[in-house]
């Protein structure tokens, strides 16, 4: 029966498309988990940066200790930026602003049978993962080699921690 065969082929096509949609969803979840893991590492670095900045701001240490703390600060900031610039999923950068709502090239997951909004998930709009570089978060030029520089850095790092927490919250909300 030609009619039954047509219906059968149509349903088979739908099943195949829905299976691919499930795979697309799983890939999207993996991508978000990758970003979340990198953001967690960056968060740990920010906490350590704040700790050594607080140490450098005290009047009980000398210049030699501050120079040593500045070296660690610079190394950690470089690692922070390396994570932001190198974290990717299937060649797609994750923490450089590519997943921000304002990005021109968006990442949309096709989940269903047609192109309606109900069958597509726009990661950029849902996550709005803005760049997480030291420059974007406002501490790229900080120096803790002096106590006054450390005091300035403390304020900038507090703001950076707050901004990163907001970003992580959006990522976590999408994962739930």
Indicate where each model-derived feature is located.
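Primary detection of the long, small/polar-rich alpha-helical "axial" segments characteristic
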Residues: 1-176
């Amino acid at each position: 029966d030609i009619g039954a065969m047509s219906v059968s082929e149509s349903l088979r096509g739908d099943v195949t498309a829905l299976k691919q949609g499930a795979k697309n969803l799983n890939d999207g979840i993996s991508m978000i988990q990758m970003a979340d893991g990198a953001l967690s590492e960056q968060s740990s670095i920010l906490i350590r940066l704040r700790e050594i900045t607080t140490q450098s701001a005290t009047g009980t240490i000398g210049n030699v200790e501050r120079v040593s703390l500045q070296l660690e600060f610079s190394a950690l900031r470089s690692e922070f930026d390396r994570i932001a610039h190198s974290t990717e999923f299937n060649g797609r950068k994750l923490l450089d602003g590519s997943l921000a709502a304002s990005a021109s090239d968006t990442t949309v997951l096709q989940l269903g049978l047609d192109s309606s909004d109900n069958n597509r998930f726009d990661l950029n709009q849902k996550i709005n993962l803005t760049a997480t570089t030291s420059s974007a978060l406002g501490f790229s030029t900080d120096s803790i080699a002096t106590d006054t520089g450390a005091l300035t850095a403390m304020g900038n790092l507090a703001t950076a921690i707050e901004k990163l927490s907001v970003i992580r919250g959006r990522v976590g909300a999408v994962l739930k």
